[in-house]
Amino acid sequence: CLTDSVTRACDALGPDHPDTLASRNSLAGAYRDAGRLDKAIALYEQNLEDSIRVLGTDHPSTLTSRFNLASAYRAAGRLEEAIPLYEQVVAGRSRVLGPDHRSTLTARDDLAATYWEAGRLDEAITLKKQILADAMRIMGPDSPGASTARLNLAATYRDAGRLDEAVNVHQQ
């Protein structure tokens, strides 16, 4: 049981040990997966606060904690709380891991999707255009990643009522 694992880690290693933080993050993920978003969010919030204090703002584990909290906020429909966290994750992962790292690209894609869900279509389009250009550069224009990015951009243009641009993206 994950709650036992967190308790054991806390007792053996202390509440601020990186393994204890990782165990708490896993427990929060289990709560999220079980649909218990309130418990997940509370645990993610505490874990992020502790990770920043113990590991620092740009530590990869802290960036993961921030990403997980943003994802939980998004799942709970708390989009305006998720967006600044995703923006911080994108900036941090770009600095720490590089702009082309898979984790950075994942965060950018989730940020773009959250912009879209929040009705911030212009911001979603701008970011999705960058994602498509990067996917074509990194993976190749005919790669599955570029195809997915192309479809996502076209759908966002469609939702924004920019149908000619949606068709043009599909025809690329």
Q: Locations of the language-model features?
A:
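Intrinsic-disorder-linked linear interaction elements in eukaryotic regulatory proteins
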Residues: 1-172
